[in-house]
Amino acid sequence: MSDLKLSPLVIKLGGAALDCAETLSKLFGAIAQYQNQAQRRIVIVHGGGYLVDDLMAKLQLKSVKKDGLRVTPYDQIPIIAGALAGTANKMLQGQAIKDGINAVGLSLADGGLCHVEELDPELGAVGKATPGDSTLLQAILATGAMPIISSIGLTAQGQMMNVNADQAAVAVAGALDAELVLLSDVSGVLDGKGHLIATLDAKQADALIAGKVITDGMIVKVKAALEAAQDLGRPIEVATWRYPEKLAKLFGGESIGTRFLP
């Protein structure tokens, strides 16, 4: 991994981290410290499922998931886009600015970064993102700013789409040819006894899914990580944000969670 410092780093932030200002502050502190020390270009991609859940509950709308993915009726996408591209994005940007980071808030559509199409008619306005044109993103990174990208995209027809944030991060990393780290509530993939699995390939993952050891939203995360490892031709790490003091090691190439092998 001698070219590690040269390649950009995409960090996917998700889960309950977005719900706690103290955690976010520690996270951005660790990210800023690493960025300064390594002089590395960093991009954040985020979801914000809990914000969507809160908003749906307030509006008395039901949240439905299919195979770990949120069903997004087309008449609800303006609300969900508002929560993710609006509230969640500005909240993260605000925290980053507070911690001394020059942050720029973006979506998957900006500069044609990702192509987005409907994933499955049964899921509604849920998109699949594929890598697009990273020229604008590269220009922003060249200024030393840190892009913070929501998982809301637009189709070629201008239709708003909600993209799973893990899948969105994979597409952004593909567009940039970047290293990718997926940070979440969990420390990585656990075996049937609750122990962390250090490395995982597609065959092992399929066996764990078939054996119901990997379930629900973790299936989406595992599939996204395996797809990323294949597409990018490099290992992808799934780890927790809960120990900010370990993140510099992780960003520098050490494994602290589960490493997915191409």
From Swiss-Prot:
Entry GO CC:
cytoplasm
Residues that, per the record, bind substrate: G48, G49, R70, N162
Q: What subcellular locations does the record give?
A: Cytoplasm
Biological process terms in GO annotation: arginine biosynthetic process via ornithine; L-arginine biosynthetic process
Q: Domain of life, per the record?
A: Bacteria
Matching NCBIfam families, A to Z?
argB
Catalytic EC class: transferase
Which species is listed as the source?
Vibrio cholerae serotype O1 (strain ATCC 39315 / El Tor Inaba N16961)
Alphabetic keyword roster? Amino-acid biosynthesis, Arginine biosynthesis, ATP-binding, Cytoplasm, Kinase, Nucleotide-binding, Transferase
Protein name, please? Acetylglutamate kinase
Site (Transition state stabilizer) found at K12, K221
Job of this protein: Catalyzes the ATP-dependent phosphorylation of N-acetyl-L-glutamate.
Q: Which reaction does it catalyse?
A: N-acetyl-L-glutamate + ATP = N-acetyl-L-glutamyl 5-phosphate + ADP
Give EC number(s), comma-separated.
2.7.2.8
Gene Ontology MF annotations = acetylglutamate kinase activity; ATP binding
Q: Which family does it belong to?
A: Belongs to the acetylglutamate kinase family. ArgB subfamily.
What is the first-listed, main subcellular location in coarse terms?
cytoplasm
Instruction: Name the pathway it acts in.
Output: Amino-acid biosynthesis; L-arginine biosynthesis; N(2)-acetyl-L-ornithine from L-glutamate: step 2/4
Q: What gene does this protein come from?
A: argB
